[in-house]
Swiss-Prot record:
Membrane topology: Peripheral membrane protein
GO cellular component: cytoplasm; plasma membrane
InterPro entries from the UniProt entry: AAA+_ATPase (IPR003593), P-loop_NTPase (IPR027417), Signal_recog_particl_SRP54_hlx (IPR013822), SR_rcpt_FtsY (IPR004390), SRP/SRP_N (IPR036225), SRP54_GTPase_dom (IPR000897), SRP54_N_sf (IPR042101)
Pfam family name, one: SRP54
Protein name in UniProt: Signal recognition particle receptor FtsY
Length: 456
């Protein structure tokens, strides 16, 4: 069921995922190259910055020179004293020589803190091996350059303002989905939806929801881009499929008995068979039913519905061909009230919305019987034709819900997706075969999961 549409939706999911991942990887590679280039240039700048302060420092030998000058001054003073006091000459001379030797040793062996100054005084070139003080600034600058390459906005219009943002997100385990990533896949999805008989207005709504959900989003580290796209598709489909949805079983359970259901639609779409299927459906839930044949114009209509009634052991209310449909269904309601029957299932003649006389009959049934629910029946395989007919019937005589037959033969799913959004009235059941049990209660969530499930 709906396999063709399912494949198209999966193709869209894969296309978006591949496009986003490929562009993110390319942006990350480019940003990494930029970071490497910045890192390579950083050590040279660091060396230059380290050398300039050494050259600009004042000569560190000045304190020693001052010390030597002081020693010379002391020697001269000692010499004067020696001249004035010849008796102390020998001791003074010994003291001067000791001081001179001490100063000489001090000048020849500089303190550890003056190593750089000594190198500056002697003019020696610095060692080729970087010192511990030089390594740390180099690594810091390289790290800063790499971070800047990933986080700063790129002002080059040729690469796009989002390139580095995408690269940064990819580097942290995330992928940013940009509008350009969706342009081609969304166009292909739109064509796929239209080819699957999804109504134009519905297709546009689906695409707009996907844009809102995806553009500018980043996937979490715990999920894939495909999962993010699947979530957007899920929300977009669910929003259009679930319009007007209500709990059919609860509505029947809470309604005053007998509950009257009227079935309408064009000829040959399976209204009568659907009535028989619902009779079996209600029987399983413990409800009693009576069938009323309001299709009084079609030859053989009484015989067709009688076969179903006999097969299911149900009471049938019918008039002669050409009778008043409203009168037949009214008699069905009277019988249900008299025999404590829970539900009346009333058939009507197939008609087009342009058949004024037949549409007037529906209006009369509404006045005379006051049905609890009027259900539109059409074929799922009719696609957009079914959608348009549902719209027209709803405009002419308001419907409460729709039933799609032959859903098991429909690979497109366009009608199933579109009818609720177009009419504002929900799809309630899907016919999925010829047997009386071959009818499914329509569940929007289950429908979306079926469309987005993995290919078998």
């Amino acid at each position: 069921m709906f396999d063709g549409l399912k494949k198209k939706l999966n193709r869209f999911r894969n296309d978006v995922e591949e496009t986003a991942e490929e562009k993110a990887e390319a942006a990350a590679d480019e940003a990494e190259s930029d970071a490497d280039a910045e890192a390579e240039s950083a050590p040279a700048d660091t060396d230059n910055a380290a050398v300039e302060p050494e050259a600009s420092e004042p000569a560190a030998a000045d304190p020693d020179a001052d010390a030597v000058g002081d020693a010379d001054a002391g020697s001269e003073a000692d010499a004067v004293d020696a001249a004035d006091a010849p008796a102390d000459a020998e001791s003074s001379s010994a003291a001067v020589e000791a001081d001179a030797e001490s100063e000489s040793e001090s000048a020849a062996t500089p303190e550890p803190d003056s190593e750089v100054d000594a190198g500056a005084d002697t003019g020696d070139e610095p060692s080729g091996e970087p010192t511990a003080d030089e390594v740390e600034p180099r690594e810091s600058l390289a790290s800063d350059a790499a971070k800047a390459a990933l986080t700063e906005e790129d002002e080059d219009d040729s690469s796009g303002p989002g390139r580095l943002r995408r690269a940064a997100a990819f580097a942290t385990g995330k992928v940013v989905i940009e509008e350009e990533d969706l342009e081609d896949p969304l166009w292909e999805l739109e064509m796929a939806l239209l080819q699957s008989d999804v109504e134009m207005q519905v297709a546009e709504e689906i695409l707009e929801t996907i844009r809102e959900k995806l553009i500018g989003e980043t996937r979490k580290q715990v999920e894939s881009t495909g999962q993010l796209v699947s979530e957007a598709l899920h929300d977009a489909l669910y929003e259009v499929i679930s319009v007007g949805q209500f709990d059919f079983d609860q509505r029947i359970a809470e309604a005053d008995k007998p509950v009257t259901l009227i079935f309408t639609g064009i000829n040959g779409v399976g209204k009568t068979t659907t009535i028989a299927k619902l009779a079996k459906y209600f029987e399983k839930q413990g409800y009693s039913t009576v069938l009323a044949n309001g299709d009084t114009y079609r030859a053989g209509a009484n015989e067709q519905i009688r076969e179903h009634a006999e097969a299911l052991d149900k009471k049938l209310i019918a008039h002669e061909q050409g009778g008043d449909p409203a009168a037949v269904i009214y008699d069905g309601v009277e019988y249900a009230e008299a025999h404590d029957i829970d539900i009346v299932l009333g058939d009507t003649a197939g008609r087009l919305h342009t058949s004024n006389d037949l549409m007037a009959q529906l209006e009369k049934i509404d006045r005379v019987v006051g049905p609890d629910l009027t259900l539109f029946v059409d074929e799922a395989v009719a696609g957009q034709d079914a959608v348009e007919r549902a719209r027209q019937f709803n405009d002419a005589a308001a419907i409460d819900g729709a039933i799609l037959t032959k859903a098991d033969a429909d690979s497109n799913g366009g009608a199933a997706i579109s009818i609720a959004y177009v009419t504002g009235k929900p799809i309630l059941f899907l016919g999925v075969g010829q047997g009386y049990d071959h009818i499914e209660k329509f569940d929007p969530e289950q429908m979306v999961e079926r469309l987005l499930g993995e290919d078998e």
